[in-house]
């Protein structure tokens, strides 16, 4: 794979997205031709947007329906409502360059960019209505006091056979066979799912706000193979969305292990478990490693995993770019934990005090650098934001590229993405930026 940015003379390009009300582009995918396809959100709606990778000119856009949380946030003048909602925020790009997303109208959709005579547009290829399986008495301008249940699609993911798995905020889970349209659904009995999930040949790995599950499909029905409870703490922390794990499950060790975090009150912990068979003399859980400062740990982003190692950042103390004022409250911290070769436990390899309020980090296998988005507090109280790289082996800082100051450069829970050619993108409060070699 192409190496991520590692240069003394980078070129930084910024792209504001939206009109008077800017859109934050939080999720990145890249087509087989290298075009960035971004999911960009705002108070009014989400959009899919296609960009030229060189000029960053927008080539096409596709409007998605407004989420009920967006309407409620505007009516109640409370932006936090939006940031506590992860529905419709996860997408993936399939092998035919089509975005697959669950939208706020309880539909699973396949939408892709198409080009004709030099002009680009988005085309919807498929749409499946899940309203029969997901309650939708949701907040709207004409229904500001709903008395029924409102649930929302959070994530859609494919398994190795092409069947689409889906989950909702309130713990519903199901499968959709795109060839036949067959839908089968069940639920977790009231447990919430606020994150994405992981899929391997061994099944789907879903973390709720109570436990980690491994599931397989029995005639389309998601069926539990094992369940492992974790310490969910006594409440939601600053830097997390709900009372439970803030991480999407991550597969590592060639599929042998799955990792996630708990929400313990004093220190959150990294947990690693066997995905399938448990060796004789061992238990399902290989280790539980408390990390970061006492009374100062929380995370709401996926981990980086490579071989037997897990890298996690600390988001404790940060809320969102619209409401956060005191950035000295951001606790900071990064840790690398490794599973022992004999699987007798896990050890901390290195720790860093780097402050990362909210980014989804990425590792470049081309150069062994893990990329984060950090800041320095300036004397005037502003923040100087920077793309920062830590060496995977040592945890030492090897890259620091300042990008800009002010709220426009705050990533605000958006992710980092490394393009196929090595260019590095960061979602920002008012669009996105790209860092490339000169």
Q: Can you annotate each of these PLM segments?
A:
Residues 256-260, 300-406:
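Loop/turn-rich, solvent-exposed surfaces of beta-rich toroidal or solenoidal domains
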Residues 20-30, 68-92, 132-156, 190-201, ...:
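Repeated scaffold domains used in trafficking and secretory/extracellular systems
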């Amino acid at each position: 794979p192409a190496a991520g940015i590692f240069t003394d003379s980078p070129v930084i390009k910024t792209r504001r997205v939206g009109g008077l009300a800017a859109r934050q582009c939080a999720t990145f995918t890249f087509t087989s031709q290298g075009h960035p396809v971004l999911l960009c959100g705002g108070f009014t709606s989400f959009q899919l947007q296609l960009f030229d990778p060189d000029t960053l000119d927008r080539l096409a856009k596709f409007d998605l329906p407004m989420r009920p949380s967006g309407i409620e946030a505007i009516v109640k003048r409370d932006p936090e409502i939006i940031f506590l909602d992860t529905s419709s925020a996860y997408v993936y790009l399939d092998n035919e360059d089509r975005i697959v997303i669950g939208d706020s109208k309880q539909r699973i959709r396949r939408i892709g960019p198409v080009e004709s005579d030099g002009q680009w547009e988005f085309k919807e290829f498929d749409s499946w209505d899940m309203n029969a399986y997901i309650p939708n008495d949701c907040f709207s301008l004409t229904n500001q006091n709903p008395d029924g249940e409102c649930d929302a699609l959070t994530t859609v993911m494919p398994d190795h056979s092409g069947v689409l798995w889906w989950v909702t905020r309130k713990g519903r889970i199901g499968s959709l066979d795109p060839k036949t349209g067959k839908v089968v659904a069940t639920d977790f009995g009231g447990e919430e799912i606020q994150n994405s999930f992981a899929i391997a040949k061994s099944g789907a790995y879903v973390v709720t706000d109570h436990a980690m599950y491994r599931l397989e499909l029995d005639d389309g029905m998601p069926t539990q193979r094992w369940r492992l409870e974790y310490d969910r703490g006594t409440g939601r922390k600053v830097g997390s969305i709900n009372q439970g794990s803030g991480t999407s499950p991550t597969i590592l060790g060639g599929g042998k292990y799955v990792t996630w975090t708990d929400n313990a009150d004093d220190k959150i912990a990294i947990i690693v478990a066997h995905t399938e068979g448990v060796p004789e003399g061992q238990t399902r859980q290989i280790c539980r490693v408390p990390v970061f400062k006492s009374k100062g740990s929380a995370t709401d982003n996926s981990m980086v995993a490579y071989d037997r190692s897990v890298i996690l950042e600390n988001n404790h103390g940060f809320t969102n770019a619209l409401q956060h004022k005191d950035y000295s409250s951001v606790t900071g911290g990064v840790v690398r934990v490794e599973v022992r070769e004999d699987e007798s436990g896990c050890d901390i390899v290195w720790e860093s005090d780097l402050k990362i309020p909210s980014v989804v980090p990425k590792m470049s296998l081309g150069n062994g650098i893990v990329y984060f988005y950090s800041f320095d507090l300036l004397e005037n109280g502003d923040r100087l934001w920077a793309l920062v790289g830590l060496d995977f082996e040592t945890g030492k800082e090897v890259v620091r590229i300042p990008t800009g100051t002010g709220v426009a450069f705050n990533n605000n829970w958006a992710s980092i993405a490394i393009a196929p050619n090595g260019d590095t993108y960061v979602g920002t409060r008012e669009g996105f930026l790209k860092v490339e070699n000169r």
